């Protein structure tokens, strides 16, 4: 029996060769492969195939079948590509990408379903890995709600609340503070990794690693001198943890070359490499050309628009406790905000030379906008046409910046960052019309945790008003979420929190070549007087955007 492509779409969703528009952007992904056997699709509902003896195998033990299946969904994943498949989940892990069902009645079955299996209908939806934000200032715990509502399931950073140190730096200093923050975050259904203060004090750094820190943050507000950089990286190398750095904007203790000499070829994650978020003025962006540096942006400068420059001056003064009545403070702020480097940053992202995107939450950036701004930038750069790549490659390049590359960088890619089998089932489902603004459902560790839900006194699930609400997985945080810690701190952190603690690993021998879709090492030159940036000998012309997709249309209500 043959049916039209249009009819197939109505019944089972798109298939191989179909194109899907993402939100109201100019980006159209194309399904590269459909892993589901035609004619044997599993569909839930009255008169459908997901019934006992049909798509569900009877008389089979629980351990032999999936706990959960997401059917006929389009998978958008930096390792798997753009494919159509079922997703099989067991014990909170993804165990199958392919075709689920009953092998006695269906062809091409990769994993078995039975009466113990729950079903989420994925027809017409997109599944991505849960997004990862590597630049979280723990100013307020309520950021968790905004992160979930934007598709984020793993947050990496530091802080203690609205203290001056936290409003400026992603640092949880000292073991006592780590204990307090870990106990507090234990009630929220996301994965967390806490960064402690990088310093010249070895004993202090070893103490925090033994008590649950996952790595270090070097920040100029606490001191980013060459001695601090060297000692922090020395300890990190011994304990296999990552170091993030916000370098010395005022060049007080050295210039970019001095920082690179202190780093001495060792792996480091460089934050907000454009410089508006902080870093050697005016040429920190040149760090993107270093093979041992894993570079990221923060979202306030992305994409560069007609309002970006003006917004940043006042924002910077507030975040870094600067006094507008002190000329030196004003000069410091103005040295960090440069339109020329913002333009270059847009181009470097599209080129694949900046490997990650993050928020800098409540400390210049917005935790709920990282996904939006990432794909606004992809839209803008496709529109400009400076780099000619197909939409699948461009979308996967930008998706990798907020999924697998942050996971690799921080030593947690064995657990999160992809939907590949063996990883934690942190899955975000999207209606393509709302990607990547508002997820349809967030699945955390195999449990539905955050979702759109209607009036709970109504007769059906989606009676107005439909709002994001915590689901049962939210209240089972200890079962579905994880802390990530230095190996030496796993045991002690496990005594503080209820949930499992997993070790970070394989962070110290990474290079830019380990960054998926984002491993380019261009030649970068910065004019110290005009701030003009040349990339591979060319000044890219990236004008500020006057309008963007994924904006007011999605926030009328």
Curated annotation (Swiss-Prot):
It catalyses: urea + 2 H2O + H(+) = hydrogencarbonate + 2 NH4(+). Ni(2+) 2 binds at residues 217, 246, 272. One of its GO terms (biological process) is urea catabolic process. It is found in: Cytoplasm. The keyword Metal-binding applies. Pfam families: Amidohydro_1, Urease_alpha. Substrate binds at residue 219. The keyword RNA-binding does not apply. Its EC number is 3.5.1.5. The active site is at residue 320. Its cofactor is Ni cation. Keywords: Cytoplasm, Hydrolase, Metal-binding, Nickel. Residues 130-557 form the Urease domain. The modification N6-carboxylysine is found at residue 217. Binds 2 nickel ions per subunit. GO terms for molecular function: nickel cation binding; urease activity. One of its GO terms (cellular component) is cytoplasm. Heterohexamer of 3 UreC (alpha) and 3 UreAB (gamma/beta) subunits. Belongs to the metallo-dependent hydrolases superfamily. Urease alpha subunit family. This is Urease subunit alpha. It comes from Sulfurisphaera tokodaii (strain DSM 16993 / JCM 10545 / NBRC 100140 / 7) (Sulfolobus tokodaii). The gene is ureC.
